[in-house]
């Protein structure tokens, strides 16, 4: 996207020169305007601003008719045209549009368009400008760049016909306006109605095909692909004419198209339409013009075939000459017109199916593709278009095949972008979901293997750049949040950097794994327990083979949690819950219960004489802390060692440790940290304020490692006597803030303090949930 947007911004600037409307358009707005030509740029801008500039949300809203265009007085002119257009486009915008275009619709309809459009010729083209704010890049800009040849209003030549094309209110109409601009008089005059009718028939056939495609392919995609072909055909055909003019205009016109979201999707189809253009290119510019006119005219003729009748026969020879090339073009144009008409009504619908084959409606990717492809534009893209023009639908179907081309085009784009944007580019959309789920569980080798089946890119992304996976699976929030965890599982706290007080690994224990899915927020940490349902798996995945890790990684979270709970029930009994579910046992802290550490809290935690405890503990606790810190939460031995030392002093054994966590961690705000062993926290910032000597040793073991623990023990010993606020002061005042931060990694500390043997999940549930 970024690459595309950059170039596209430049393009938009370039094209905005002609139209003030698009001058301020964002990339999203530009894309929307191209995709929904019948929408006013300002309306689309409003939608974007209301939806955080989320292109996808706005497209979804529009395509699913969740929002409707305002029809203010300001648009009455527009309304007239639209009404007429809608009359023609009423059924699908595409089918009736092509029908009317193909002269199926009575010429009277077309004529009224011509009539009304001459009236609103100035209005309609501007509307196109608005509706096509981005089409300005494509259709309008092509029109304006053609302006040198014919004014955008094309009033110079035949505003009526030009307007007639807009009457479709479709992207094709916009293009046809452009086409008539250059060849309006000549083309409309030159092309006989017969040719228009042929075009109409082709258009109808293609339209039907297009309709099928629309059914099969998202309207938007089809619209963009087909419309852009027309656009490019028109613009490119104009471009050949313009080739005499600066090439930039050619490039500019196609460029916005390809630069445009639609063009990105359309590039292959666009190539087909450009096909006649190359002939004009090879031919003298006049033939180019003729063909352009012809190309334009097929669209115009479809819409204005009868008006053309009186005028057109003169050019019949010319047209007939170019018709062989044009017919494929015209059919694409007709298709584009019908598709455009249809897509105007249901632009996204067409796009999606095609995009499935092609990139999913991921605009960025297709745009990128287009950028790669379309920036050259002019003859190059025209040739390609000529290739595709012959088989526009096949390519739509074959767009997977054409995707290689797009891929080549996109080669400029990082493959990662493609992957990011959607895994969309691949038919892998389904896979994408699987991948997301799997990627959520990716790290399980089984799924990785399965994914290997998917795409190398996906595998690479999943395994190697988890971040990329996050990007790819942009909305797989679990992946984003949890993929980081495997590294962090060692540091239960670090995973949730924000919650110093909680040892989430305890949650992973899933004392209440089945209790509620919510409980598994922590399970997501995939703490040491290795459970946590799908989430724990991220961290643990290869590590544990819980039922939660069953090969069916895509189990619902509940299933996983339940399975994990079952597994955990055994584990939990075996393992002490290092802490009640990852939250410190506040009960113990709040109440001096010797069982729960009354020694720790009452005696040490709050002004209770901790000195003996701390002194006794600290040496060992520093050692134990070092062990624990390194060993990490699950090492009961370290905790027990500390506990042993503490026990001697406290008489409560590990309970000091137990209370320490709260103290050193300040697990509960404001608690132990000030009085507790902040003395140890004197240790430096490393120790949490609440750590207290024991806590500090533990926290040190957690955050700082043994060295901190040792320091904390020595400082804690010193500060023991200075316990309480003095300890805090001695703790260097850093202690309260820093310790919390450092303690955060120490969540494991709870596990480190297995001595809290009381950690029966039942104790905690009442208060907690």
Swiss-Prot record:
It is found in: Cytoplasm; Nucleus; Chromosome, Telomere. InterPro entries: CUE (IPR003892). One of its GO terms (cellular component) is chromosome, telomeric region. The keyword Nucleus applies. This is RNA polymerase II degradation factor 1. GO terms for biological process: DNA repair. The gene is DEF1. Residues 17-26, 90-107, 148-168, 217-227, 322-345, 352-368, 399-472, 607-640, 655-666, 675-718, 726-735, 745-759 have a biased composition (Low complexity). The lineage of its organism: Eukaryota, Fungi, Dikarya, Ascomycota, Saccharomycotina. Residues 137-147, 192-205, 287-299, 384-396 have a biased composition (Basic and acidic residues). Residues 1-27, 66-368, 381-472, 540-559, 602-769 are annotated as: Disordered. Residues 277-286 have a biased composition (Pro residues).
């Amino acid at each position: 996207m970024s690459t595309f947007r950059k170039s596209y911004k430049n393009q938009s600037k370039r094209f905005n020169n002609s139209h003030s409307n698009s001058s301020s358009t964002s990339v999203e707005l530009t894309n929307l305007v191209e995709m929904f030509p019948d929408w006013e740029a300002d309306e689309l801008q409003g939608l974007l601003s209301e939806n955080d500039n989320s292109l996808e949300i706005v497209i979804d809203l529009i395509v699913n008719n969740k929002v409707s265009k305002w029809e203010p007085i300001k648009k009455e002119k527009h309304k007239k045209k639209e009404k007429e257009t809608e009359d023609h486009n009423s059924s699908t915008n595409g089918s009736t549009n092509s029908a009317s275009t193909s002269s199926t619709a009575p010429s009277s309809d077309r004529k009224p368009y011509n009539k009304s459009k001459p009236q609103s010729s100035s209005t309609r083209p501007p509307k196109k400008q608005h509706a096509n704010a981005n089409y300005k890049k494509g259709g309008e800009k092509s029109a304006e760049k053609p302006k040198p040849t014919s004014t955008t209003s094309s009033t110079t030549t035949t505003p009526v016909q030009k307007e007639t094309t807009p009457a479709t209110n479709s992207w094709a109409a916009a293009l046809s306006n452009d086409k008539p601009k250059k060849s309006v008089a000549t083309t409309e005059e030159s092309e006989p109605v017969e040719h228009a009718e042929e075009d109409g028939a082709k258009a109808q056939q293609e339209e039907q095909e297009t309709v099928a495609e629309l059914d099969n392919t998202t309207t938007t995609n089809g619209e963009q692909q087909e419309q852009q072909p027309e656009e490019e055909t028109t613009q490119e055909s104009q471009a050949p004419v313009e080739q005499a003019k600066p090439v930039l205009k050619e490039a500019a016109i196609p460029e916005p198209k390809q630069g445009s979201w639609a063009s990105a999707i359309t590039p292959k189809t666009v190539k087909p339409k450009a096909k006649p253009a190359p002939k004009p290119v090879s031919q003298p510019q006049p033939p180019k013009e003729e063909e352009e006119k012809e190309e334009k005219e097929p669209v115009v003729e479809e819409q204005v075939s009868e008006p053309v009748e009186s005028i057109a026969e003169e050019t019949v020879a010319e047209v007939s000459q170019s018709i062989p090339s044009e017919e494929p073009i015209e059919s694409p144009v007709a298709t584009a017109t019908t598709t455009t008409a249809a897509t105007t009504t249901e632009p996204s619908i067409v796009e999606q199916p095609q995009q499935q084959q092609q990139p999913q409606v991921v605009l960025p990717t297709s745009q990128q593709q287009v950028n790669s492809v379309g920036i050259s534009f002019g003859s190059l893209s025209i040739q390609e278009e000529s290739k595709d023009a012959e088989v526009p639908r096949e390519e739509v179907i074959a767009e997977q095949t054409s995707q290689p081309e797009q891929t080549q085009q996109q080669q400029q784009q990082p493959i990662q972008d493609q992957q990011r944007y959607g895994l969309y580019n691949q038919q892998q959309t389904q896979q994408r979901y699987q991948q997301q789920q799997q990627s959520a569980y990716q790290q399980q080798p089984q799924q990785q293997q399965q994914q290997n089946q998917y795409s190398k890119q996906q595998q690479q992304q999943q395994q190697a750049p988890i971040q990329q996976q996050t990007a790819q699976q942009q909305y797989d929030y679990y992946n984003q949040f949890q993929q980081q965890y495997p590294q962090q599982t060692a540091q239960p706290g670090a995973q949730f950097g924000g919650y110093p007080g909680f040892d989430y690994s305890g949650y992973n224990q899933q004392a209440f794994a089945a209790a509620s899915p919510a409980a598994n927020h922590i399970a997501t940490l995939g703490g040491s327990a290795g459970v946590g349902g799908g989430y724990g798996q991220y961290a643990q995945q290869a590590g544990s083979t819980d039922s939660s890790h069953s090969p069916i990684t895509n189990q619902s979270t509940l299933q996983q949690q339940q399975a994990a709970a079952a597994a955990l029930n055994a584990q939990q009994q075996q393992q002490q819950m290092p802490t009640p579910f990852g939250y410190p046992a506040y009960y113990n802290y709040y109440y001096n219960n010797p069982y729960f550490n009354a020694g720790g809290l009452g005696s040490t935690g709050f002004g209770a004489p901790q000195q003996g405890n701390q002194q006794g503990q600290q040496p060992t606790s520093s050692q134990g802390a070092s062990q624990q810190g390194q060993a990490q939460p699950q090492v009961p031995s370290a905790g027990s060692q500390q506990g042993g030392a503490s026990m001697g002093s406290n008489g409560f054994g590990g309970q000091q440790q137990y209370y320490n966590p709260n103290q050193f961690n300040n697990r509960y705000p404001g608690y132990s940290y000030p009085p507790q062993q902040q003395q140890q926290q004197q240790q430096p910032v490393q120790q949490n304020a609440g750590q207290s000597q024991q806590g500090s040793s533990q926290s040190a073991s957690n955050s700082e490692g043994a060295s901190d623990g040792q320091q904390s023990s020595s400082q804690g010993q010193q500060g023991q006597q200075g316990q309480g606020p003095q300890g805090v002061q001695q703790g260097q005042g850093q202690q309260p803030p820093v310790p919390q931060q450092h303690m955060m990694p120490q969540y494991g500390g709870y596990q480190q303090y297995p001595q809290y043997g009381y950690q029966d999940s039942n104790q905690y549930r009442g208060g907690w949930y």
